[in-house]
């Protein structure tokens, strides 16, 4: 199990302190499983590297500043989690009403935007994708704004966030501030910590299965996903994510849980 960050963050006053603490974690933070034996593991440090690079991309390529609007149309994917955290890092407002920046995985998700964002970030699902490998032409047919290839652009961004952290009163959702989000993250971390999540054998679990079955289809869902992820990470657990497009059955998920020493906390009543 990774270090429990609650003692360090119990009096935190900003999300920036959470991000800074996670950047020092070298144990697994995100573990992603999909079909064909695909497994991606990101330490806290690597996750925050993705977050910082993604936040810089939002600043440099999408003209994002504090209060700019962003919306993600996607099923749960580890890259989308990193990008949603980057939006918080940059002070963006999660909003699906005429967002300045849209995020999609393909033409089908791009078509869900009722009004074209100024910038559309295309994310590839491939584990080692260096660029978008899907049908770009199909995306052009449903979207008439500027299309940016996330995988091709993000790697060239600086490893450290180059912007200013948002003020605690900056809104993440309408009526929900950064300070509110921090309070929710710490609340969830304390819940994980108080339950002392354990395997059926009684041994401490190393990871918890992401419970949020939402897509990123609404701003509220997006925020619920990242709050659950950050709450678990602050409490010292890695977050196991199974690809929602893979259609894993409970019988298929069971050996994944066992191999990662992970727990589905819904079964334990968290």
Regions found by a protein language model. Give the residues of each.
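Long terminal accessory regions outside catalytic cores
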Residues: 1-13, 33-40, 46, 55, ...
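Flexible, non-catalytic linker and terminal segments flanking ANL/adenylate-forming cores
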Residues: 1-10, 128-172
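A short N-terminal helical cap/helix-turn-helix that marks the beginning
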Residues: 8-30, 186-190
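Conserved AMP-binding/adenylate-forming core of the ANL superfamily
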Residues: 30-64, 162-219, 250-253
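Conserved AMP-binding/adenylate-forming
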Residues: 57-98, 197-237, 241-244
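Short beta-strand elements of ligand-binding domains
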Residues: 74, 104-105, 118-126
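Conserved ATP-dependent adenylate/AMP-binding module captured primarily in the ANL superfamily
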Residues: 93-114, 127-141, 145-146, 188-208, ...
